[in-house]
């Protein structure tokens, strides 16, 4: 029996009060898992953790998007705009998981902020505030 591909998906993370919960929470937009199911994959939600022990079982990695910015320190810049909103724990986790997963030579997809993270991970930079740039 063939096993369906197992795809790990990173989650969004919020600590703010007066949102969904007064406690920190993870979120994943449903369309990520719906699309993977549609194409015969088994999605696995990857909550943000301090350590990353076992990701060898993943056949692919999807770095999801979110409503935040990559901390400019990751691409060698200081914060130049008060519009920058980072989620330090999430970005740190996603960099750690990429460091462990990339050497496995398996598929990685970044969507929206995930694509930006991949760009920075591989040495690229970002425009911090497009409105002031143009």
Where does each model-flagged region fall?
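N-terminal beta1-alpha1 cap of cysteine-dependent amidohydrolase-like domains
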Residues: 1-109, 120-121, 127, 131-134
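Active-site loop->helix "elbow" adjoining a glycine-rich segment at hydrolase catalytic centers
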Residues: 113-115, 122
């Amino acid at each position: 029996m063939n096993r369906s591909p197992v795809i790990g998906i990173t989650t969004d993370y919020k600590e703010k009060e007066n949102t969904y919960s007064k406690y920190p929470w993870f979120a994943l937009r449903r369309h990520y898992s719906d699309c993977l199911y549609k194409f015969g994959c088994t999605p696995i939600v990857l909550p943000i953790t301090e350590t990353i022990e076992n990701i060898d079982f993943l056949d692919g990695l999807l770095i999801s998007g979110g409503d935040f910015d990559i901390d400019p320190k990751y691409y060698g810049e200081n914060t130049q705009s008060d519009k920058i909103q980072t989620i330090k724990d999430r970005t740190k986790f996603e960099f750690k998981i990429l460091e462990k997963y990339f050497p496995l030579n398996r598929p990685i997809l970044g969507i929206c902020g995930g694509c930006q993270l991949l760009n920075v991970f591989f040495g690229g930079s970002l425009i911090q505030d497009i409105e002031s740039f143009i």
